[in-house]
C-alpha cells in the first residue's frame, strides 16, 4: 500500500487487494518507521476496505436512482480529490440496519451529451433489495471514482458539479430534492 504523500505501508498480515483505492485502519510503533526509506510496518486493525466505485458513460435516463442520498457533504466531510483523477465522495444514505448495507450501490454517471462550462456528474444510489424496509438510520460510504476516462472525453474542467437526489428526512425518493455540490478542479 502507498499513502497519498508517498509512504509505503507494509504489514505481516496479508489480505487480497484486488482494487486500487482502500480505506485502511492501522496502528504502528515508532520503532517500525524508517524515515529515510519512507516505509512503515503496521498492524491492520481491520481488513482494508476497497472503496473503488464505478463511473458509467451514457444517458442519465439509462442510469436512474431508486433511492435518495442523505447528503454528500456534512460538517467537514465533502468530496475531495486524492490526486489528479481520483475523486473521493463521502456518501451518506439511509439504511435499515447493518445487514441492509450490502444491497446499496453507488455510481457516478457522465452524460457526454450534456456539455457546458463545468463538468456535470450524476450520483446514482440504488438498492437491489425489493423488500419494503423502514430505513431510519444513516451510514456513510466513501467512494473513490477514477475520472481519468471522463477527462479524456470532456477535457479537464475548472469546476465539477455533482448532482444527486437528496432527502435528509427519510429514505423516500419521491420527496427528495435534486441537489448539487460544486468543487473546483485546479490540477
Model-predicted regions and their roles:
Residues 12-40:
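Flexible glycine-rich surface loops and low-complexity tracts that mediate binding to linear polymers
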Residues 170-187:
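Short beta-strand elements
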Residues 2-16:
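Beta-strand/loop nucleic-acid-binding surfaces
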Residues 24, 88, 121, 143-145, ...:
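Hydrophobic residues positioned within well-ordered beta-strands of beta-sheet architectures
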Residues 72-134:
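Short helix-loop boundary/capping segments
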Residues 32-89:
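Surface-exposed beta-loop interaction hotspot
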Residues 18-20, 127-169:
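Short, solvent-exposed, Trp/other aromatic-anchored flexible loops in extracytoplasmic proteins
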Residues 29, 91-93, 146-150:
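Solvent-exposed residues in well-ordered beta-strands and their adjoining turns
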Amino acid at each position: 500500500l502507498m499513502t497519498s504523500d508517498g509512504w509505503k505501508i507494509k504489514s505481516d498480515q496479508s489480505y487480497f487487494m484486488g482494487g486500487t483505492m482502500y480505506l485502511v485502519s492501522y496502528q504502528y510503533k515508532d520503532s517500525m518507521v524508517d524515515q529515510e526509506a519512507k516505509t512503515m510496518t503496521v498492524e491492520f486493525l481491520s481488513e482494508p476496505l476497497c472503496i473503488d466505485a464505478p463511473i458509467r458513460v451514457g444517458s442519465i435516463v439509462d442510469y436512474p436512482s431508486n433511492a435518495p442520498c442523505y447528503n454528500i457533504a456534512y460538517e467537514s466531510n465533502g468530496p475531495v480529490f486524492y490526486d489528479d483523477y481520483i475523486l473521493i465522495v463521502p456518501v451518506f444514505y439511509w439504511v435499515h440496519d447493518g445487514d441492509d448495507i450490502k444491497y446499496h450501490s453507488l455510481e457516478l454517471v457522465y452524460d457526454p451529451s450534456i456539455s457546458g462550462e463545468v463538468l456535470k456528474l450524476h450520483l446514482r444510489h440504488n438498492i437491489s433489495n425489493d423488500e419494503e424496509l423502514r430505513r431510519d438510520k444513516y451510514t456513510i460510504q466513501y467512494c473513490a471514482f477514477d475520472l481519468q476516462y471522463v477527462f479524456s472525453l470532456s477535457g479537464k474542467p475548472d469546476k465539477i458539479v455533482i448532482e444527486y437526489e437528496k432527502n435528509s428526512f427519510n429514505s423516500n425518493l419521491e420527496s427528495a430534492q435534486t441537489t448539487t455540490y460544486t468543487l473546483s478542479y485546479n490540477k
